[in-house]
Amino acid sequence: MRITEILALFMVLVPVSLVIVAMFGYDQGNGFVQASRFITMEPNVTSSSDDSSLVQRDQEQKDSVDMSLLGGLLVSGFKKESCLSRYQSYLYRKASPYKPSLHLLSKLRAYEELHKRCGPGTRQYTNAERLLKQKQTGEMESQGCKYVVWMSFSGLGNRIISIASVFLYAMLTDRVLLVEGGEQFADLFCEPFLDTTWLLPKDFTLASQFSGFGQNSAHCHGDMLKRKLINESSVSSLSHLYLHLAHDYNEHDKMFFCEEDQNLLKNVPWLIMRTNNFFAPSLFLISSFEEELGMMFPEKGTVFHHLGRYLFHPSNQVWGLITRYYQAYLAKADERIGLQIRVFDEKSGVSPRVTKQIISCVQNENLLPRLSKGEEQYKQPSEEELKLKSVLVTSLTTGYFEILKTMYWENPTVTRDVIGIHQPSHEGHQQTEKLMHNRKAWAEMYLLSLTDKLVISAWSTFGYVAQGLGGLRAWILYKQENQTNPNPPCGRAMSPDPCFHAPPYYDCKAKKGTDTGNVVPHVRHCEDISWGLKLVDNF
């Protein structure tokens, strides 16, 4: 019986062993089973599923990179740790409804190459700077590199919008933009261009003369026009010209916006510019720029929105201020409302008229709910009804913040929304030259740009920056005149772009005054300043 069982077991095991050997084979050289033939016998479901996950993950990473580069507006290659905001900002704001045109992207890539070739530290830059040291005799040769230098001037909001304008001009005229500002500027903003710098070197030949540049300077464009010292012949021997385009410029300075003068400026290697204006609207009225600008910006009212997001990335120090505050006070809200309050002619304290105007605006426009009265205030909202709105207030004082905070703490709202009022700082007054003041100002502008809806004050470049970066059509609190409340208290902006506060009113061809807000449909008068100019669409 025992022998029979052993034979039966042997008869079963031998065929099975032969089948296994036939299927797998055996490599005597390395002792490993050859499984290649076996692997092809049936599909590996797990492997296919993993491949699908990898493809999906790769696509998500690709989409993430594309979002962080703002639809091609930015380029990769920067060290992420050197400028966290460049790669993280998209996580804090909704995707822009405005897409940069392919022509704008092409112009930006071409400019980046120009800046890399001609920027500080290159042989071309050194040769071009030598022209400033030579005696001005004969024609100047700058080896194809020309420059426009932005002089540090005015408050931070004005600086940001004016630099964007100068950069646009640089792209239109194939010049390299260099900005004065030194360490403080570098403390606020990351470098926008890869493998180069946009900061004017401290030892720049003319830097020591900047404080003396003015409307009566020997090389001032406007003054030379006034004295009839500038023409096609004389300009060819100039190494530089000073352009005074600040709010107080005169009729001769404003000739900068004429075609004839642009033709003269083409031949000057160095243009030194002082401006605190967003003068882009008037560039659209120069015939030689018109077609190019139209291709760069099919949506005319998005010039600062695109250029601002391209140029201005908060430094790591400022980005820390932004992200810490956002996470602490804004991240969990169902809706974020920005409220930028700037009262220019109020000596001190809180104005009851301004308070009334603010409350009327936010409630009439359904940005914040009205207060509940009577029996209704005792009804508790359900979980579904409960909605948190976080209001970010920016102001030099705390008065308006305290009023709103108390109002929405002590009273329920008719919508049962819970309203949180927050204010990051209250500096008392503008302190342009203080580093921490500017850090906070830049952080607050950026925080406002991250909100879903925004209210800004008339005339304020602080608000313009926030509106433009966010691509928002803000509600503008109209400026009070003769101590009376405007009716309506606020109105919606026509586009996200800033207002040009001091435009020229001159027809260069006819050589006479004209209303430059009625020349083309996309350059209109501003909502908050009747004489200002603004780029708009479909109005």
UniProtKB/Swiss-Prot annotation:
Cysteine pairings via disulfide bonds: none
Enzyme Commission no: 2.4.1.-
Transmembrane stretches, start-end: 6-26
Keyword Mitochondrion carried by entry: no
Segments on the Cytoplasmic face: 1-5
Membrane topology: Single-pass type II membrane protein
Major localisation: Golgi
GO CC terms: Golgi cisterna membrane
One of the protein's GO biological processes: cell wall organization
Topology, Lumenal side: 27-539
Pathway in which the depicted protein is active: Protein modification; protein glycosylation
Similarity annotation: Belongs to the glycosyltransferase 37 family.
Role played: May be involved in cell wall biosynthesis. May act as a fucosyltransferase.
Protein's name in the database: Fucosyltransferase 2
